[in-house]
Amino acid sequence: MKMNLEKLGERIIEGGDILVEEALELANLRGSALYPLFGAASRIKEHFVGDKVFLCSIVNAKSGRCPENCSFCAQSAHHKTDAPVYSLIDEERMVACAREAEKNGSSCYGIITSGTSIKKGEELERICNAVRRIRRETGITPSCSLGIINHETASALVEAGVETYHHNLETSRSFFPNVCTTHDYEEDVNTVRVAKKAGLKVCCGGIFGLGESVAQRIEMAYTLRELDVDSVPLNFLNPIAGTKLENAENITPMECLQTIALFRLILPTKRISICGGREKNLRDLQSWIFFAGASGTMIGNYLTTTGRAAEEDWQMLKDLNLSVASCCE
């Protein structure tokens, strides 16, 4: 398998693709057989996206009361959790959080809102005004994640200065009905297409540990490749009390790393960032993500869970002798 991986890595670097059957075979690797896979993923990453690390941060700009019933989400109105509930924060707070993210070393800053979609009118206008100020007053690049959007909303975001729209598929098409039944998978796919058509870059990934099979993780990766998204955030479930998945078992650190490596082989040219749940699932192996094909990570807090201190992540990067990208392009 080592020689096969070397040849597969060379094929991908030369512009070839990994076949679904090959990805499924690599998903069966265990133990020390994973190390050549990580090596191949790391070489592919360095060839296509370089060795600098991309850092991003987010603000939970509107929390709770979401009508969707996503099984993992603490903000769903269908669950009883301790997640905070509040309406859209004011413009000043969005800008202040952008400054804090920039201070912590992030080059990208996402404004995230709960709910199926953002309300047109005052809410969208407030976000657009904040984006304009962030553009003027900071050096950080703003992005938005406002749920399902149409062309009108996408165009308004472009006009305000948003470069990237974030919208996760969460899981594969075949597993999605087990995760959410309040909207259709195709609505999420269409949002990605709407954003791209409007001229936005798209950040789109998912979350692992929902009960999906390894084959379904690979299925999602190929869907992302078909959609030609620009960057791929990978999350690992951190079970929240009160949600349907509160008793779900965490994925093992090596399984997390194997998943990252497979996504790198399937999506060789994309920025792959490791976000929510990395502390809980990867534990002492968090630093290994960069040797398994990841090219970025989220620092600071997540939507409803706490991340580790930015200083710890910076120390990790220093210990690894990795430099940080100065922009999120």
Swiss-Prot record:
Keywords: 2Fe-2S, 4Fe-4S, Biotin biosynthesis, Iron, Iron-sulfur, Metal-binding, S-adenosyl-L-methionine, Transferase
Pfam families per the UniProt record, alphabetical: BATS, Radical_SAM
Function description: Catalyzes the conversion of dethiobiotin (DTB) to biotin by the insertion of a sulfur atom into dethiobiotin via a radical-based mechanism.
Binding-site residues for [2Fe-2S] cluster, renumbered to this chain: 143, 203
Domain Radical SAM core: start-end pairs: 48-278
EC number in record: 2.8.1.6
Catalytic activity: (4R,5S)-dethiobiotin + (sulfur carrier)-SH + 2 reduced [2Fe-2S]-[ferredoxin] + 2 S-adenosyl-L-methionine = (sulfur carrier)-H + biotin + 2 5'-deoxyadenosine + 2 L-methionine + 2 oxidized [2Fe-2S]-[ferredoxin]
Quaternary context: Homodimer.
Cross-referenced Gene3D superfamilies: Aldolase class I
Cofactors: [4Fe-4S] cluster; [2Fe-2S] cluster
Pathway linked to the protein: Cofactor biosynthesis; biotin biosynthesis; biotin from 7,8-diaminononanoate: step 2/2
Protein name per UniProt: Biotin synthase
A GO molecular-function descriptor: iron ion binding
Positions bound to [4Fe-4S] cluster: 66, 70, 73
Family the UniProt entry places it in: Belongs to the radical SAM superfamily. Biotin synthase family.
Disulfide bonding pattern of the chain: none
Keyword Phosphoprotein tagged: no
Keyword S-adenosyl-L-methionine attached: yes
InterPro entries referenced in this protein's UniProt entry, alphabetically: Aldolase_TIM (IPR013785), BATS_dom (IPR010722), Biotin_synth/BioAB (IPR002684), Biotin_synthase (IPR024177), Elp3/MiaA/NifB-like_rSAM (IPR006638), rSAM (IPR007197)
Any GO BP: biotin biosynthetic process
Cofactor annotation comment: Binds 1 [4Fe-4S] cluster. The cluster is coordinated with 3 cysteines and an exchangeable S-adenosyl-L-methionine.
Highest taxon above the source species: Bacteria
